[in-house]
Amino acid sequence: MATNFDATRLAVQTAFPTNDLLFDDKEMPSIHVFIPKFRLCDVLSTQSTETHPAFIVNGKEIDGFWFGKYQSTCTDSGRAYSLPAEDPTVSHNLDWFVTQTNAKGAGWHEISNAEWAAVALWCHKHGCEPKGNNNYGKDSSETYYEAIPVPGVQDNGKTARVRTGTGPLPWSHNGRMDGIWDMNGNVWEWCIGLRLVKGELQIIPNNNAADNSVSNGASSSAWRAIKASDGSLVAPDGNGTTTGTVKLNYTGGHWEWDTTISDSKDESRGALFKNTTAASSVGDAAKLILMSLALMPDTAMTGDGIDTTYGNDNFWANNAADERCPIRGGCWFSGGGAGVFSLNLNNPRSSSWTNGGGRSAFVKLPAEA
């Protein structure tokens, strides 16, 4: 470990026991938040005691994962870092962000959709879905709270990106200083391990994508489709037409998971996440996978503090194109549609924007345990 960071690490651990300074192959630090393992029944209405997929890597359970406390700032060394009060790096495609995180060493990776979903579901269950920079420097529901703007970065004279982690406490995932910041707005965040292929949902099983030796590439053999009848994972046919697998259909002004697509369009269409449904062709096991990956609401989850509107977050998608990869969270102009359940499956992996970035994560691979 780089000894000149010892005092800093001790200070971080003392103030926030769930936070730590993690060091990469260059002995450079990032601040990450530990998310301990939990079961599906801990965050969903199900009675299933199965471990959430974010805590299973290469067939083995892990104690938890380290989620970047801040959106990624990438340096000239070709590495992505999680640090406070920085300008989040933008304007790069998915594979570029994957390269930046993978270069840090074994266990480092761009955040996976499974990991993002685990944090989002925890927030939902505990009634603390975070606010953020979704309205030009502030949250659309707030009037006075603001974060520190990135100097020289504006959108038609208004605040665009803000410095990482400089917003008020409600902008952290748990409403505390030790939480994860900016999952609502600021910049969209690329996630790995999930995609649409001509509307067919494909995943890299569990959190295997966290092992950066497993390819997240377009032609990777790790991709699997989900059998709608029983939730089993099968090799896709490559055309998005695998028989009996879960696919994304658009019906009645909302998204619906089904085994067939009656309304397929190579364009971006949006709807509220809370209105996403599953057709009768999708069995309970497959629906549980969808809910665990924050791809549809758990309508049976009710009670004090539970926001059954899921923040009125938006779900955008293109269910006809060859490959569409996920970005999560929204950006500085997404308004009330931004949030931890905001999902955009409209973009190819080659896309880049000034409002699109990433976030790093780390797991201790089971073989190293």
Sequence positions of predicted segments:
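Short low-complexity stretches enriched in small and charged residues
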Residues: 18-26, 140-144, 311-320
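C-terminal, surface-exposed recognition/capping segments
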Residues: 1-4, 150-160, 167, 174-177, ...
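Short secondary-structure boundary/capping segments
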Residues: 124-129, 195, 204-207
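Charged, compositionally biased non-catalytic regions
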Residues: 1-18
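Extracellular adhesion/carbohydrate-recognition regions
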Residues: 22-107, 198-265, 269-273, 324, ...
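Amphipathic alpha-helical scaffolding segments
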Residues: 117-118, 194-198
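Short aromatic-cysteine micro-motif
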Residues: 50-183, 187, 256, 263, ...
